[in-house]
């Protein structure tokens, strides 16, 4: 269900942009999926295609880019990637992080110094990184 809500927000944003720009056709949407969010791209794509039916975006190309999750310790400066520690997560933890990425601080610590004071440098959230439209008179 979470993926459908994300798809709805992406589609509405893309269609609003296309309308503001006077587009006759929405050709493509490029979406970045942060690894930390652990979103199922297949479900999002299916939902987006369904939501685009009957609109100027029907048949639009949908591209996903996965952005790797990277963390940086505020105490020692060490940087590490989610994939380096993800194996220690059980399904409950993965689900918690999926719905509320901020809880990652409760489950992770810097692998170098053990601090839980770290920032998410990249790989959090879902956002549109590109929209391609066709305006009147363009081919």
UniProtKB/Swiss-Prot annotation:
InterPro entries xrefs: Hydgase_Ni_incorp_HypA/HybF_CS (IPR020538), HypA/HybF (IPR000688)
Amino-acid positions noted as binding Ni(2+) in the UniProt annotation, renumbered to this chain: 2
Keyword Protein biosynthesis: no
A Gene Ontology BP annotation from the UniProt entry: protein modification process
Superkingdom per UniProt: Archaea
Residues reported in the UniProt entry to bind Zn(2+): 73, 76, 110, 113
Short name of one Pfam family: HypA
Keywords: Metal-binding, Nickel, Zinc
Molecular function per GO: nickel cation binding; zinc ion binding
Family affiliation: Belongs to the HypA/HybF family.
Function: Involved in the maturation of [NiFe] hydrogenases. Required for nickel insertion into the metal center of the hydrogenase.
NCBIfam families: PRK03824.1
Protein name per Swiss-Prot or TrEMBL: Hydrogenase maturation factor HypA
Organism: Thermococcus onnurineus (strain NA1)
């Amino acid at each position: 269900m979470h993926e459908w809500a994300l798809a709805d927000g992406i589609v509405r944003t893309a269609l609003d942009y296309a309308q503001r720009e006077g587009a006759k056709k929405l050709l493509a949407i490029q979406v970045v999926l942060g690894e930390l969010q652990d979103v199922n791209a297949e479900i999002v794509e299916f939902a987006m295609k369904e939501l685009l039916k009957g609109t100027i975006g029907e048949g639009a190309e949908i591209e996903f880019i996965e952005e790797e999750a990277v963390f940086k310790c505020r105490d020692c400066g060490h940087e590490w990637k989610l994939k380096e520690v993800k194996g220690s997560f059980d399904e409950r933890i993965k689900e918690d992080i999926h719905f509320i990425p901020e809880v990652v601080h409760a489950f992770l610590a810097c692998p170098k110094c053990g601090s839980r004071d770290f920032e998410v440098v990249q790989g959090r959230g879902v956002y549109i990184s590109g929209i391609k439209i066709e305006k009147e008179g363009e081919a």
